[in-house]
Protein backbone atom coordinates (compact mmCIF):
# COMPACT_ATOMS: atom_id res chain seq x y z
CA UNK A 1 0.00 0.00 0.00
CA UNK A 2 1.14 3.50 -0.71
CA UNK A 3 1.86 6.01 1.98
CA UNK A 4 -1.15 7.80 3.44
CA UNK A 5 0.73 10.99 4.32
CA UNK A 6 -1.24 13.22 1.94
CA UNK A 7 -4.51 11.33 1.78
CA UNK A 8 -6.54 14.14 3.37
CA UNK A 9 -5.24 16.75 1.01
CA UNK A 10 -7.47 15.57 -1.73
CA UNK A 11 -4.28 -27.68 24.42
CA UNK A 12 -4.57 -27.59 27.99
CA UNK A 13 -5.28 -30.66 30.22
CA UNK A 14 -7.70 -30.33 33.12
CA UNK A 15 -6.07 -29.69 36.39
CA UNK A 16 -2.92 -28.20 34.88
CA UNK A 17 -1.14 -25.71 37.16
CA UNK A 18 -3.13 -27.13 40.02
CA UNK A 19 -6.41 -25.67 38.81
CA UNK A 20 -9.35 -27.88 39.67
CA UNK A 21 -13.05 -27.44 38.99
CA UNK A 22 -15.08 -26.17 41.91
CA UNK A 23 -18.78 -26.66 42.48
CA UNK A 24 -20.95 -23.57 42.14
CA UNK A 25 -21.82 -23.57 45.81
CA UNK A 26 -18.17 -22.97 46.59
CA UNK A 27 -17.54 -20.32 43.98
CA UNK A 28 -19.87 -17.38 43.68
CA UNK A 29 -19.45 -16.17 40.15
CA UNK A 30 -20.19 -12.75 39.02
CA UNK A 31 -19.95 -10.44 36.26
CA UNK A 32 -20.91 -8.69 33.29
CA UNK A 33 -21.81 -9.86 29.06
CA UNK A 34 -19.80 -11.21 26.34
CA UNK A 35 -20.97 -10.92 22.83
CA UNK A 36 -21.11 -13.37 20.04
CA UNK A 37 -22.09 -12.33 16.55
CA UNK A 38 -23.85 -15.01 14.74
CA UNK A 39 -24.51 -14.93 17.77
CA UNK A 40 -23.01 -11.65 18.83
CA UNK A 41 -24.64 -9.97 21.69
CA UNK A 42 -24.34 -6.82 23.45
CA UNK A 43 -26.59 -6.54 26.25
CA UNK A 44 -28.06 -3.66 27.92
CA UNK A 45 -28.72 -4.25 31.53
CA UNK A 46 -27.62 -3.56 35.01
CA UNK A 47 -24.84 -5.08 36.92
CA UNK A 48 -21.24 -5.31 36.15
CA UNK A 49 -18.22 -7.28 36.62
CA UNK A 50 -15.44 -4.84 37.00
CA UNK A 51 -11.92 -5.82 36.15
CA UNK A 52 -9.08 -7.06 38.24
CA UNK A 53 -9.88 -8.26 41.74
CA UNK A 54 -13.60 -8.64 41.14
CA UNK A 55 -13.18 -11.46 38.62
CA UNK A 56 -14.13 -14.84 40.10
CA UNK A 57 -11.97 -17.89 39.55
CA UNK A 58 -12.79 -20.17 36.63
CA UNK A 59 -14.91 -23.21 37.48
CA UNK A 60 -17.57 -25.63 36.29
CA UNK A 61 -21.30 -24.86 36.49
CA UNK A 62 -24.16 -27.32 36.50
CA UNK A 63 -26.80 -27.01 33.80
CA UNK A 64 -29.42 -26.56 36.52
CA UNK A 65 -27.55 -23.52 37.88
CA UNK A 66 -27.44 -21.86 34.46
CA UNK A 67 -31.03 -22.78 33.73
CA UNK A 68 -32.09 -21.03 36.93
CA UNK A 69 -29.84 -18.04 36.24
CA UNK A 70 -31.38 -17.45 32.79
CA UNK A 71 -34.99 -18.10 33.83
CA UNK A 72 -35.07 -21.41 31.97
CA UNK A 73 -33.20 -19.85 29.03
CA UNK A 74 -36.05 -17.44 28.44
CA UNK A 75 -36.18 -15.73 25.07
CA UNK A 76 -36.49 -12.47 27.02
CA UNK A 77 -32.92 -13.02 28.21
CA UNK A 78 -31.38 -13.49 24.75
CA UNK A 79 -28.74 -10.85 24.07
CA UNK A 80 -27.30 -12.23 20.81
CA UNK A 81 -27.58 -9.62 18.07
CA UNK A 82 -29.36 -12.07 15.79
CA UNK A 83 -31.81 -13.03 18.52
CA UNK A 84 -33.28 -16.51 18.30
CA UNK A 85 -31.98 -16.87 14.72
CA UNK A 86 -28.37 -17.10 15.89
CA UNK A 87 -26.84 -20.61 15.76
CA UNK A 88 -25.34 -20.25 19.24
CA UNK A 89 -27.43 -18.13 21.56
CA UNK A 90 -26.09 -15.81 24.24
CA UNK A 91 -28.24 -15.13 27.29
CA UNK A 92 -27.85 -12.79 30.18
CA UNK A 93 -28.40 -14.41 33.53
CA UNK A 94 -28.17 -13.72 37.22
CA UNK A 95 -26.64 -16.05 39.76
CA UNK A 96 -27.81 -16.57 43.32
CA UNK A 97 -25.21 -14.10 44.54
CA UNK A 98 -26.99 -11.45 42.39
CA UNK A 99 -24.15 -11.04 39.91
CA UNK A 100 -24.91 -10.87 36.20
CA UNK A 101 -23.38 -13.29 33.72
CA UNK A 102 -23.42 -13.97 29.99
CA UNK A 103 -24.13 -17.56 28.98
CA UNK A 104 -23.31 -18.84 25.50
CA UNK A 105 -25.34 -21.95 24.69
CA UNK A 106 -23.97 -24.04 21.83
CA UNK A 107 -26.15 -26.06 19.49
CA UNK A 108 -26.57 -29.75 20.29
CA UNK A 109 -23.47 -31.78 19.49
CA UNK A 110 -21.43 -28.71 18.48
CA UNK A 111 -18.75 -30.17 20.74
CA UNK A 112 -19.52 -33.91 21.00
CA UNK A 113 -16.44 -34.70 23.07
CA UNK A 114 -16.87 -33.16 26.55
CA UNK A 115 -13.20 -33.47 27.49
CA UNK A 116 -12.11 -31.50 24.44
CA UNK A 117 -14.64 -28.76 25.15
CA UNK A 118 -13.61 -28.59 28.81
CA UNK A 119 -9.91 -28.40 27.95
CA UNK A 120 -10.54 -25.59 25.46
CA UNK A 121 -12.66 -23.73 28.01
CA UNK A 122 -10.05 -24.11 30.75
CA UNK A 123 -7.39 -22.77 28.37
CA UNK A 124 -9.42 -19.62 27.76
CA UNK A 125 -10.53 -19.45 31.40
CA UNK A 126 -6.95 -18.99 32.58
CA UNK A 127 -6.82 -15.60 30.87
CA UNK A 128 -7.52 -12.66 33.15
CA UNK A 129 -7.25 -9.08 31.91
CA UNK A 130 -9.24 -5.88 32.25
CA UNK A 131 -9.30 -5.54 28.46
CA UNK A 132 -11.28 -8.80 28.21
CA UNK A 133 -14.81 -9.75 29.14
CA UNK A 134 -13.36 -12.72 30.99
CA UNK A 135 -14.52 -16.33 30.85
CA UNK A 136 -15.48 -17.46 34.34
CA UNK A 137 -16.88 -20.94 33.76
CA UNK A 138 -18.31 -23.62 31.54
CA UNK A 139 -20.85 -26.44 31.60
CA UNK A 140 -20.63 -29.97 30.18
CA UNK A 141 -23.85 -31.71 31.16
CA UNK A 142 -25.00 -34.51 28.86
CA UNK A 143 -25.12 -33.00 25.39
CA UNK A 144 -25.20 -29.46 26.76
CA UNK A 145 -22.17 -27.24 26.18
CA UNK A 146 -22.17 -23.73 27.61
CA UNK A 147 -19.68 -20.98 28.37
CA UNK A 148 -20.13 -18.45 31.18
CA UNK A 149 -18.55 -15.00 31.07
CA UNK A 150 -18.64 -11.61 32.71
CA UNK A 151 -21.65 -9.58 31.61
CA UNK A 152 -20.95 -6.22 30.00
CA UNK A 153 -23.89 -3.86 30.59
CA UNK A 154 -23.28 -1.11 28.02
CA UNK A 155 -23.82 -2.75 24.63
CA UNK A 156 -21.49 -3.50 21.73
CA UNK A 157 -19.32 -1.33 19.52
CA UNK A 158 -21.69 -2.21 16.66
CA UNK A 159 -24.63 -0.75 18.59
CA UNK A 160 -22.76 2.46 19.43
CA UNK A 161 -21.37 2.88 15.91
CA UNK A 162 -24.16 1.67 13.64
CA UNK A 163 -27.38 2.01 15.66
CA UNK A 164 -26.83 4.94 18.01
CA UNK A 165 -29.75 7.08 19.19
CA UNK A 166 -28.50 10.07 21.18
CA UNK A 167 -24.87 10.51 20.20
CA UNK A 168 -22.24 8.81 18.08
CA UNK A 169 -18.86 7.84 19.50
CA UNK A 170 -16.47 10.79 19.57
CA UNK A 171 -13.09 10.52 17.84
CA UNK A 172 -10.96 10.18 20.99
CA UNK A 173 -13.15 7.32 22.20
CA UNK A 174 -12.80 5.55 18.86
CA UNK A 175 -9.04 5.75 19.23
CA UNK A 176 -9.36 4.33 22.74
CA UNK A 177 -11.45 1.42 21.48
CA UNK A 178 -8.83 0.53 18.88
CA UNK A 179 -6.03 0.79 21.42
CA UNK A 180 -7.76 -1.26 24.13
CA UNK A 181 -8.69 -4.04 21.72
CA UNK A 182 -5.13 -4.10 20.39
CA UNK A 183 -3.96 -4.48 24.00
CA UNK A 184 -6.42 -7.34 24.53
CA UNK A 185 -5.18 -9.15 21.42
CA UNK A 186 -1.57 -8.61 22.42
CA UNK A 187 -2.23 -9.99 25.91
CA UNK A 188 -3.92 -13.10 24.47
CA UNK A 189 -1.05 -13.58 22.04
CA UNK A 190 1.53 -13.23 24.82
CA UNK A 191 -0.36 -15.80 26.90
CA UNK A 192 -0.33 -18.35 24.08
CA UNK A 193 -3.87 -17.75 22.77
CA UNK A 194 -3.19 -15.74 19.57
CA UNK A 195 -6.18 -17.03 17.58
CA UNK A 196 -9.42 -15.07 17.73
CA UNK A 197 -12.39 -16.21 15.69
CA UNK A 198 -14.54 -13.73 13.80
CA UNK A 199 -13.30 -10.47 15.31
CA UNK A 200 -15.79 -7.72 14.50
CA UNK A 201 -17.63 -4.78 16.07
CA UNK A 202 -20.08 -7.12 17.80
CA UNK A 203 -17.22 -8.69 19.75
CA UNK A 204 -16.27 -5.38 21.35
CA UNK A 205 -18.28 -4.68 24.51
CA UNK A 206 -18.48 -1.85 27.01
CA UNK A 207 -18.30 -2.50 30.75
CA UNK A 208 -19.93 -0.57 33.60
CA UNK A 209 -17.22 2.12 33.36
CA UNK A 210 -17.75 2.45 29.61
CA UNK A 211 -14.35 0.88 28.92
CA UNK A 212 -14.15 -1.30 25.81
CA UNK A 213 -13.52 -5.02 26.34
CA UNK A 214 -12.94 -7.88 23.93
CA UNK A 215 -15.39 -10.77 24.21
CA UNK A 216 -13.75 -13.97 25.41
CA UNK A 217 -16.21 -16.06 23.37
CA UNK A 218 -14.20 -15.40 20.21
CA UNK A 219 -11.24 -17.23 21.73
CA UNK A 220 -13.11 -20.50 21.11
CA UNK A 221 -14.65 -21.75 17.87
CA UNK A 222 -18.40 -22.16 17.58
CA UNK A 223 -17.90 -25.92 17.27
CA UNK A 224 -15.10 -28.45 17.31
CA UNK A 225 -14.91 -28.59 13.50
CA UNK A 226 -17.03 -25.58 12.68
CA UNK A 227 -16.38 -22.36 10.87
CA UNK A 228 -14.34 -19.68 12.55
CA UNK A 229 -16.02 -16.86 10.64
CA UNK A 230 -19.75 -16.28 10.56
CA UNK A 231 -19.71 -12.84 8.97
CA UNK A 232 -20.12 -11.98 5.29
CA UNK A 233 -17.35 -13.43 3.13
CA UNK A 234 -16.47 -9.89 2.01
CA UNK A 235 -14.99 -9.30 5.48
CA UNK A 236 -13.19 -12.64 5.79
CA UNK A 237 -9.36 -12.86 5.53
CA UNK A 238 -8.42 -14.00 2.01
CA UNK A 239 -6.24 -16.87 3.26
CA UNK A 240 -9.17 -18.24 5.27
CA UNK A 241 -11.18 -18.45 2.06
CA UNK A 242 -8.33 -20.48 0.56
CA UNK A 243 -7.58 -22.96 3.34
CA UNK A 244 -10.19 -22.49 6.08
CA UNK A 245 -7.53 -21.91 8.75
CA UNK A 246 -7.28 -19.07 11.23
CA UNK A 247 -3.80 -17.72 11.91
CA UNK A 248 -2.53 -14.80 14.00
CA UNK A 249 -2.27 -12.85 10.75
CA UNK A 250 -5.96 -13.55 10.08
CA UNK A 251 -6.76 -11.91 13.42
CA UNK A 252 -4.77 -8.83 12.37
CA UNK A 253 -6.78 -8.67 9.13
CA UNK A 254 -10.03 -8.73 11.12
CA UNK A 255 -8.67 -6.02 13.42
CA UNK A 256 -8.19 -3.94 10.29
CA UNK A 257 -11.90 -4.28 9.50
CA UNK A 258 -12.70 -3.03 13.02
CA UNK A 259 -10.47 0.00 12.39
CA UNK A 260 -12.48 0.66 9.21
CA UNK A 261 -15.67 0.54 11.30
CA UNK A 262 -14.20 3.08 13.72
CA UNK A 263 -13.11 5.38 10.90
CA UNK A 264 -16.29 5.23 8.85
CA UNK A 265 -19.05 4.56 11.37
CA UNK A 266 -20.28 2.02 8.84
CA UNK A 267 -19.64 -1.64 8.13
CA UNK A 268 -18.05 -1.37 4.70
CA UNK A 269 -16.24 -4.15 2.79
CA UNK A 270 -12.44 -3.93 3.07
CA UNK A 271 -12.00 -4.04 -0.72
CA UNK A 272 -14.20 -0.96 -1.10
CA UNK A 273 -12.32 0.88 1.65
CA UNK A 274 -8.97 0.00 0.12
CA UNK A 275 -10.12 1.38 -3.23
CA UNK A 276 -10.90 4.69 -1.50
CA UNK A 277 -7.53 4.66 0.27
CA UNK A 278 -5.68 4.02 -2.99
CA UNK A 279 -7.66 6.78 -4.67
CA UNK A 280 -6.94 9.13 -1.74
CA UNK A 281 -10.68 9.60 -1.18
CA UNK A 282 -10.31 9.38 2.57
CA UNK A 283 -12.85 12.09 3.31
CA UNK A 284 -15.48 9.80 1.79
CA UNK A 285 -14.28 7.00 4.06
CA UNK A 286 -14.59 9.04 7.27
CA UNK A 287 -17.77 9.14 9.33
CA UNK A 288 -19.64 12.30 8.30
CA UNK A 289 -20.74 12.81 11.93
CA UNK A 290 -17.09 13.44 12.82
CA UNK A 291 -16.65 16.27 10.34
CA UNK A 292 -14.52 18.99 11.90
CA UNK A 293 -14.14 16.95 15.10
CA UNK A 294 -11.07 14.83 14.43
CA UNK A 295 -7.38 15.27 13.73
CA UNK A 296 -6.44 14.52 10.13
CA UNK A 297 -2.95 13.57 11.30
CA UNK A 298 -4.35 10.98 13.73
CA UNK A 299 -6.81 9.71 11.16
CA UNK A 300 -3.97 9.32 8.66
CA UNK A 301 -2.12 7.08 11.13
CA UNK A 302 -5.21 4.92 11.67
CA UNK A 303 -5.93 4.67 7.94
CA UNK A 304 -2.33 3.64 7.27
CA UNK A 305 -2.52 1.02 10.03
CA UNK A 306 -5.82 -0.32 8.69
CA UNK A 307 -4.37 -0.62 5.20
CA UNK A 308 -1.38 -2.53 6.60
CA UNK A 309 -3.68 -4.91 8.50
CA UNK A 310 -5.66 -5.56 5.31
CA UNK A 311 -2.68 -6.52 3.16
CA UNK A 312 -3.44 -9.54 0.97
CA UNK A 313 -0.24 -11.33 1.99
CA UNK A 314 -0.39 -12.35 5.68
CA UNK A 315 3.35 -11.87 6.20
CA UNK A 316 3.04 -8.17 5.31
CA UNK A 317 0.60 -7.44 8.15
CA UNK A 318 1.72 -6.00 11.51
CA UNK A 319 1.72 -8.09 14.68
CA UNK A 320 -0.18 -7.24 17.86
CA UNK A 321 2.74 -5.39 19.43
CA UNK A 322 2.92 -3.19 16.33
CA UNK A 323 -0.80 -2.44 16.71
CA UNK A 324 -0.35 -1.35 20.32
CA UNK A 325 2.77 0.70 19.55
CA UNK A 326 1.04 2.55 16.71
CA UNK A 327 -2.16 3.37 18.60
CA UNK A 328 -0.65 4.22 22.01
CA UNK A 329 0.65 7.70 21.01
CA UNK A 330 -2.83 8.66 19.76
CA UNK A 331 -4.37 8.44 23.25
CA UNK A 332 -4.68 12.17 23.96
CA UNK A 333 -7.64 12.21 26.40
CA UNK A 334 -6.48 9.54 28.82
CA UNK A 335 -7.68 11.63 31.77
CA UNK A 336 -11.30 11.57 30.56
CA UNK A 337 -13.26 8.49 31.71
CA UNK A 338 -14.78 6.31 29.00
CA UNK A 339 -18.30 6.67 30.38
CA UNK A 340 -18.07 10.45 29.89
CA UNK A 341 -17.02 10.08 26.26
CA UNK A 342 -19.73 7.48 25.66
CA UNK A 343 -22.37 9.65 27.31
CA UNK A 344 -23.48 6.99 29.80
CA UNK A 345 -24.10 7.29 33.51
CA UNK A 346 -21.40 6.01 35.84
CA UNK A 347 -22.49 3.84 38.74
CA UNK A 348 -21.81 5.18 42.18
CA UNK A 349 -18.73 4.04 44.03
CA UNK A 350 -20.72 3.07 47.10
CA UNK A 351 -24.35 2.16 47.70
CA UNK A 352 -26.58 5.18 48.03
CA UNK A 353 -28.02 5.83 51.46
CA UNK A 354 -31.71 4.92 51.78
CA UNK A 355 -34.25 7.57 52.73
CA UNK A 356 -35.09 6.01 56.11
CA UNK A 357 -32.73 6.62 59.07
CA UNK A 358 -29.91 4.12 59.43
CA UNK A 359 -28.51 2.49 62.54
CA UNK A 360 -24.80 2.96 63.31
CA UNK A 361 -24.11 -0.33 61.50
CA UNK A 362 -26.15 0.84 58.52
CA UNK A 363 -24.30 4.15 58.42
CA UNK A 364 -20.95 2.37 58.55
CA UNK A 365 -21.96 0.03 55.74
CA UNK A 366 -23.25 2.89 53.58
CA UNK A 367 -19.83 4.54 53.97
CA UNK A 368 -18.07 1.18 53.49
CA UNK A 369 -16.20 1.97 56.72
CA UNK A 370 -14.80 -1.47 57.57
CA UNK A 371 -13.11 -0.24 60.76
CA UNK A 372 -16.42 1.04 62.16
CA UNK A 373 -18.20 -2.17 61.11
CA UNK A 374 -15.55 -4.17 62.99
CA UNK A 375 -16.03 -2.13 66.17
CA UNK A 376 -19.81 -2.60 66.03
CA UNK A 377 -19.59 -6.37 65.48
CA UNK A 378 -17.16 -6.68 68.40
CA UNK A 379 -19.60 -4.80 70.68
CA UNK A 380 -22.65 -6.73 69.44
CA UNK A 381 -20.92 -10.03 70.29
CA UNK A 382 -23.35 -12.99 69.91
CA UNK A 383 -26.65 -11.34 70.89
CA UNK A 384 -28.24 -12.19 67.54
CA UNK A 385 -27.45 -15.90 67.83
CA UNK A 386 -30.04 -16.54 70.53
CA UNK A 387 -32.31 -19.38 69.50
CA UNK A 388 -30.34 -20.32 66.40
CA UNK A 389 -27.93 -22.81 67.96
CA UNK A 390 -29.53 -24.55 70.93
CA UNK A 391 -27.86 -27.86 71.79
CA UNK A 392 -29.10 -30.92 73.61
CA UNK A 393 -27.15 -32.36 76.53
CA UNK A 394 -26.07 -35.33 74.39
CA UNK A 395 -24.35 -33.02 71.94
CA UNK A 396 -21.88 -31.73 74.49
CA UNK A 397 -19.00 -33.90 73.37
CA UNK A 398 -15.28 -33.30 73.26
CA UNK A 399 -15.74 -32.36 69.60
CA UNK A 400 -18.18 -29.67 70.68
CA UNK A 401 -15.71 -28.32 73.22
CA UNK A 402 -12.99 -28.21 70.57
CA UNK A 403 -15.37 -26.43 68.22
CA UNK A 404 -16.26 -23.79 70.78
CA UNK A 405 -12.57 -23.36 71.60
CA UNK A 406 -11.97 -22.67 67.89
CA UNK A 407 -14.70 -20.04 67.96
CA UNK A 408 -13.22 -18.51 71.09
CA UNK A 409 -9.79 -18.27 69.42
CA UNK A 410 -11.48 -16.76 66.39
CA UNK A 411 -13.21 -14.16 68.58
CA UNK A 412 -9.93 -13.22 70.22
CA UNK A 413 -8.19 -12.86 66.84
CA UNK A 414 -11.17 -10.85 65.56
CA UNK A 415 -10.90 -8.43 68.50
CA UNK A 416 -7.14 -8.15 67.97
CA UNK A 417 -7.66 -7.52 64.23
CA UNK A 418 -5.70 -10.61 63.23
CA UNK A 419 -8.20 -11.31 60.49
CA UNK A 420 -6.39 -14.15 58.70
CA UNK A 421 -6.16 -16.15 61.93
CA UNK A 422 -9.80 -15.31 62.67
CA UNK A 423 -10.79 -16.74 59.27
CA UNK A 424 -8.92 -19.98 60.03
CA UNK A 425 -10.47 -20.36 63.49
CA UNK A 426 -13.99 -19.51 62.38
CA UNK A 427 -13.60 -21.94 59.48
CA UNK A 428 -12.76 -24.72 61.96
CA UNK A 429 -15.92 -23.88 63.87
CA UNK A 430 -18.08 -23.79 60.73
CA UNK A 431 -16.64 -26.98 59.23
CA UNK A 432 -17.74 -29.10 62.19
CA UNK A 433 -21.32 -28.13 61.35
CA UNK A 434 -22.94 -29.16 64.64
CA UNK A 435 -23.61 -25.60 65.69
CA UNK A 436 -24.63 -22.90 63.20
CA UNK A 437 -23.99 -19.27 64.07
CA UNK A 438 -25.04 -16.33 61.89
CA UNK A 439 -22.66 -14.11 63.86
CA UNK A 440 -19.67 -16.28 62.94
CA UNK A 441 -20.62 -16.03 59.26
CA UNK A 442 -21.04 -12.27 59.64
CA UNK A 443 -17.68 -11.89 61.35
CA UNK A 444 -15.88 -14.09 58.83
CA UNK A 445 -17.53 -12.09 56.05
CA UNK A 446 -15.96 -8.90 57.41
CA UNK A 447 -12.61 -10.67 57.77
CA UNK A 448 -12.76 -11.62 54.10
CA UNK A 449 -13.53 -8.01 53.17
CA UNK A 450 -10.56 -6.81 55.18
CA UNK A 451 -8.41 -9.41 53.39
CA UNK A 452 -9.65 -8.18 49.98
CA UNK A 453 -11.76 -11.26 49.22
CA UNK A 454 -15.20 -9.77 48.43
CA UNK A 455 -16.51 -12.92 46.71
CA UNK A 456 -15.92 -15.00 49.84
CA UNK A 457 -17.35 -12.18 51.97
CA UNK A 458 -20.55 -12.15 49.93
CA UNK A 459 -20.85 -15.92 50.21
CA UNK A 460 -20.60 -15.79 54.02
CA UNK A 461 -23.10 -12.95 54.28
CA UNK A 462 -25.54 -14.99 52.20
CA UNK A 463 -24.97 -18.00 54.48
CA UNK A 464 -25.74 -15.79 57.48
CA UNK A 465 -29.02 -14.84 55.81
CA UNK A 466 -29.83 -18.53 55.24
CA UNK A 467 -29.35 -19.22 58.96
CA UNK A 468 -31.25 -16.12 60.06
CA UNK A 469 -33.42 -14.84 57.17
CA UNK A 470 -34.49 -11.58 58.85
CA UNK A 471 -31.13 -10.56 60.28
CA UNK A 472 -30.28 -7.00 59.12
CA UNK A 473 -26.55 -7.55 59.63
CA UNK A 474 -26.54 -10.28 56.96
CA UNK A 475 -28.07 -7.84 54.47
CA UNK A 476 -25.73 -5.03 55.50
CA UNK A 477 -22.69 -7.23 54.97
CA UNK A 478 -24.00 -8.30 51.57
CA UNK A 479 -24.38 -4.64 50.59
CA UNK A 480 -20.73 -3.92 51.39
CA UNK A 481 -19.49 -7.03 49.57
CA UNK A 482 -21.62 -6.20 46.52
CA UNK A 483 -20.27 -2.65 46.47
CA UNK A 484 -16.71 -4.00 46.65
CA UNK A 485 -17.58 -6.14 43.61
CA UNK A 486 -18.76 -3.02 41.72
CA UNK A 487 -22.38 -4.21 41.84
CA UNK A 488 -23.60 -0.91 43.18
CA UNK A 489 -27.27 -1.10 42.21
CA UNK A 490 -27.59 -4.43 44.02
CA UNK A 491 -25.61 -3.05 46.96
CA UNK A 492 -28.06 -0.15 47.31
CA UNK A 493 -30.99 -2.58 47.19
CA UNK A 494 -29.44 -4.66 49.96
CA UNK A 495 -28.81 -1.59 52.09
CA UNK A 496 -32.47 -0.63 51.75
CA UNK A 497 -33.64 -4.14 52.67
CA UNK A 498 -31.43 -4.11 55.75
CA UNK A 499 -32.81 -0.73 56.83
CA UNK A 500 -36.38 -1.99 56.38
CA UNK A 501 -35.65 -5.05 58.52
CA UNK A 502 -34.16 -2.87 61.25
CA UNK A 503 -37.23 -0.66 61.17
CA UNK A 504 -39.44 -3.73 61.67
CA UNK A 505 -37.33 -4.87 64.60
CA UNK A 506 -37.63 -1.49 66.27
CA UNK A 507 -41.40 -1.83 65.99
CA UNK A 508 -41.32 -5.05 68.01
CA UNK A 509 -39.34 -7.73 66.25
CA UNK A 510 -36.54 -9.91 67.49
CA UNK A 511 -34.00 -8.03 69.61
CA UNK A 512 -30.83 -6.80 67.99
Curated annotation (Swiss-Prot):
Region (Disordered): 8-48
MF GO annotations: ATP binding; protein kinase activity; protein serine kinase activity; protein serine/threonine kinase activity
Protein name: Serine/threonine-protein kinase BSK1
Known outcome of mutating residue 443 to Q: In bsk1-1; enhances susceptibility to fungal and bacterial pathogens
Gly residues compositional bias, start-end: 38-48
Modified residues (Phosphoserine): 230
GO biological process, one term: defense response to bacterium
Enzyme Commission code: 2.7.11.1
Modification(s) after translation: Phosphorylated at Ser-230 by BRI1 upon brassinolide (BL) treatment. Phosphorylation at Ser-230 weakens the interaction between BSK1 and BRI1. Phosphorylated by ASK7/BIN2 and ASK9/BIL2.
Record site: Major phosphorylation site for BRI1: 230
Protein family (similarity comment): Belongs to the protein kinase superfamily. Ser/Thr protein kinase family.
Coiled coil regions, renumbered to chain: 483-508
